[in-house]
Amino acid sequence: MDYLEIHSENFDDIVEDIKQRNLSRNNMPKIIVGTGLSVIYGVPGMKKLAEHLAKEIAQSSDQQLKEIWKNHCDEIEANGLEAGLANIAQNENDLVDAIKPITAKFILESEEKLHRTIYEKDTGFCRLLNYLSGTVSVDKKIIDIMTPNYDRIIEIICDKLGIGVITGFYGSLYGKFSRNLLKQPTEVYNCKNYSWIRLFKPHGSINWISENGKEYLTNDYEILKEKAEYIEIVTPGSSKYKVGMTNNTFRCMREEFNELLNPRDNYSLLIYGYGFNDDHFDTALFDSFQKNVLILSRDVKPDIINKALEKKNITVFYHEDDREYMIYKSKKYTIDVPVWDINQFADLFIG
């Protein structure tokens, strides 16, 4: 296996090639963002959530709930929350119902404490969005992002950068969902003179409320705190596909983003901090692996690494066994810098 120093002439050519294939106007990336982004801002990821759920359930008076958790806790500790609850039985759905409001409240309260930090902190992700907003097509200044994250980090960053966010909801205090806002944003928004992020959240968001058949988006923290049990998210343990198909907003988010992954269009994929834990969405994503793909993630599943070793259009930066790696044009290298870290990536590719 070859060794490459990042700050060398040999790597300069690789940087320029990746920028052309993955970060240019002609190959504007569709971006998939996982919990790797949440972690760098201090918002709890799945590991911290699992610890919090364990503590909350231990304090519950519901013995059946404790028993169900006990049945899965070894798997959760060994393979993470999502994998540990992936095969939850039909008669164990009480656990899923219980963890939804706990999860919503935990993420909401954690994020609320960090709003100022998120807004003020300069990260590689900020620089990436700022760079892409200046690179995007002059005719349609829209950058598409899909995230399974519940938090509002992306929205806060966009406010900081002065980039508008198209969420699919319209209204000021109590936004209502309209599929057409996602599908045809140019009918409503000025996408020629201003840059926009079109944000798809197929697993919901901590500012979505669904109560008594009515759904709305609000950023009023007091309302969200009061209505935490009605926050609309798909939690670990849920049948993501089933919930995603029965909830209209989740389904629209998924379907509209999948439609953007059209093989006839020019685009690339930039996947950051995403764990590939949604089988049905990942199937659509893998179909787009014929395009140029750039993956930045500390931990990458073996099957993704194997795909990169087979396909020259997939570039991966990741960490394994205390070493940093790059797979580039089907060849694996050890490198001297953790380029999977978005801050390091931005230093190298954006400056």
Walk through the language-model features, giving the residues of each.
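Gly/serine-rich nucleotide phosphate-binding loop at the start of the catalytic core
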Residues: 1-156
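SIR2/sirtuin-family catalytic core signature
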Residues: 1-31, 37-39, 243-244, 255-351
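A Trp-anchored, charged/polar loop motif used as the substrate-binding/catalytic surface
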Residues: 10-17, 121-131, 180-186, 248-260
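A general structural signal for short secondary-structure junctions and capping/turn motifs
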Residues: 20-24, 29, 134-138, 146, ...
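Short helix/loop capping segments that flank catalytic or ligand/cofactor-binding pockets
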Residues: 40-42, 154-156, 208-212, 280, ...
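Short, flexible loop segments at boundaries between secondary-structure elements
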Residues: 62-64, 175-189, 295-307
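Extended, H/D-rich, highly charged conserved domains that either
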Residues: 75-85, 137-234
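Acidic, metal/cofactor-coordinating or nucleic-acid-engaging core segments within structured domains
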Residues: 215-268
